[in-house]
A protein has these predicted regions:
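Polar low-complexity intrinsically disordered regions
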Residues: 1-5, 137-140
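P-loop NTP-binding/switch modules centered on Walker-like glycine-rich loops
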Residues: 3-76
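Short catalytic/signature loops enriched in Gly
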Residues: 46-140
Length: 140
């Protein structure tokens, strides 16, 4: 906790930005105002911290959030199924489609573009609005 506060204090007192690269969204939540989520070298979601955390608009962001341990340990971690793709041999379409429970034929052939969604955010998912509204089934 002390390190997070130190980083925030330095940002404010010096008027500087901070780029924090991490898979641990719990750490990011304590240090960031904006979040950029990347998968296979592409931005899949970006926006202000709270809206991204409260209603993620990409299935990979949902998966990352499910993998953040709760402080009380009451909820089990839910891993994202499958493995990340080989960066030199990405699948056609959305790179996340082999691991996504919401993937359709469209996802397998068409690369989704990063587009605006609610609350000043952007998502590279064909079904961003549905993900925000309905979530993603556990284990996906």
């Amino acid at each position: 906790m002390y390190k997070r506060q130190l980083l925030k204090d330095l940002q404010r007192s010096r008027g500087v930005g901070l780029i924090l690269i991490s898979h641990d969204l719990g750490v990011v939540a304590g240090a960031a105002d904006r979040v950029v989520v990347m998968y296979a070298g592409r931005v899949v979601e970006s926006g202000p911290l709270r809206p991204v955390y409260d209603h993620p608009a990409h299935p990979y962001t949902v998966g990352l959030m499910r993998s953040v341990p709760e402080t009380d340990g009451a909820e089990p971690l839910i891993p994202i199924p499958g493995s990340p793709p080989n960066p030199g041999r990405l699948p056609d379409g959305c790179a996340f489609h082999p691991r996504c429970a919401l993937a359709t034929d469209r996802c397998r052939v068409e690369v989704p573009v990063l587009r605006p969604v609610q609350d000043g955010r952007a998502s590279a998912c064909h079904y961003a609005e549905e993900v925000q509204r309905d979530g993603v089934p556990a284990g996906s």
